[in-house]
């Protein structure tokens, strides 16, 4: 389809990582150069499977990118500032927003790799991802306002995420109330941010199995209302995966 950036998003435990890996493997088989990464601190990526298939694998380690960002700021500041001024810089670097900026910039650098390869991003659970999207919008507005010294990857980030020809978000859920409601909220936030989402995946569907267990059959029956809800939210662009 020509997409350069593919996200898997949704609640924790719905199968985002597995799906992201499967997408990366399929793209590789189709001849694409693929970079698979995760923003999830839990980091469940199967590195061996991906690397053996020729996929570049990485993760955004928050502690690592924070230290790298601090060192970059210190290095630049030391070129022009006095020791007294550097104390103020160190105080600023202790601010919680420093970590947000560091993670955001690392995220922008990963997405920028779409210049040369297809980037598949396994995201952290919904709340963490929404904070990242909000940071993207805020940072973009600040860049436009100040015209400051900003990395090209940051300047290009939001336009790229909003470009339907380049970016696709696959919302992943389970056929249950809480995951579907969280996914619906995520869809609304993506729409507010102007980021394209067409496809949904409903994982672990008992209703697609031939179970004869009475409890599981009752659970499978209860799934149908949530599968119908996803069909409506996705306008029919939903894939179901059996348990």
Residue ranges and their predicted role:
Residues 1, 162-166, 174-243:
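C-terminal lobe/tail of nucleotide-utilizing enzymes
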Residues 2-6:
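Pre-Walker A (Motif I) flank of P-loop NTPase domains
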Residues 7-65, 133-137:
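Walker A/P-loop NTP-binding active-site region of P-loop NTPases
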Residues 29-30, 50-52, 111-114, 161-165, ...:
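Conserved catalytic network of the ASCE P-loop NTPase/AAA+ motor domain
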Residues 41-44, 62-65, 125-128, 175-179, ...:
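Conserved nucleotide-binding/hydrolysis micro-motifs of P-loop NTPases
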Residues 51-53, 134-140, 186-187, 214-218:
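Short secondary-structure boundary/capping segments
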Residues 53-83:
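Glycine-rich nucleotide/cofactor/substrate-binding loop typically near the N-terminus or early
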Residues 80-178, 182-185:
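Phosphate/Mg2+-binding loops and adjacent switch elements
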């Amino acid at each position: 389809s020509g997409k350069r950036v593919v996200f898997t998003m949704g609640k924790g435990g719905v199968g985002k990582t597995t799906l992201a890996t499967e997408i990366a493997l399929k793209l590789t088989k189709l001849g694409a150069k693929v970079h698979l990464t995760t923003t999830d601190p839990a980091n469940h990526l199967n590195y061996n499977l991906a690397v053996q298939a020729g996929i570049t694998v990485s993760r955004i380690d928050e502690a690592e990118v924070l230290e790298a960002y601090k060192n970059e700021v210190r290095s630049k500041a030391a070129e022009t500032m006095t020791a007294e001024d550097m104390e103020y810089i160190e105080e600023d670097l202790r601010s919680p927003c420093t970590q947000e900026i560091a993670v955001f910039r690392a995220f922008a650098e990963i997405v920028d790799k779409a210049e040369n390869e297809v980037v598949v991003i396994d995201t952290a659970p919904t709340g963490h991802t929404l904070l990242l999207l909000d940071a993207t919008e805020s940072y973009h507005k600040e860049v436009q306002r100040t015209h400051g010294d900003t990395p090209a990857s940051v300047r290009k980030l939001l336009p790229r995420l909003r470009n339907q020809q380049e970016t696709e978000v696959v919302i992943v859920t389970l056929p249950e109330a809480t995951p579907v409601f969280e996914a619906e909220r995520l869809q609304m936030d993506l729409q507010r941010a102007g980021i394209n989402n067409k496809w949904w995946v409903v994982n672990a569907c008992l209703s697609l199995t031939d179970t004869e267990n009475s409890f599981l059959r009752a659970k499978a029956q209860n799934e149908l209302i949530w599968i119908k809800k996803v069909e409506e939210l996705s306008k029919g662009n939903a894939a179901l995966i059996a348990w």
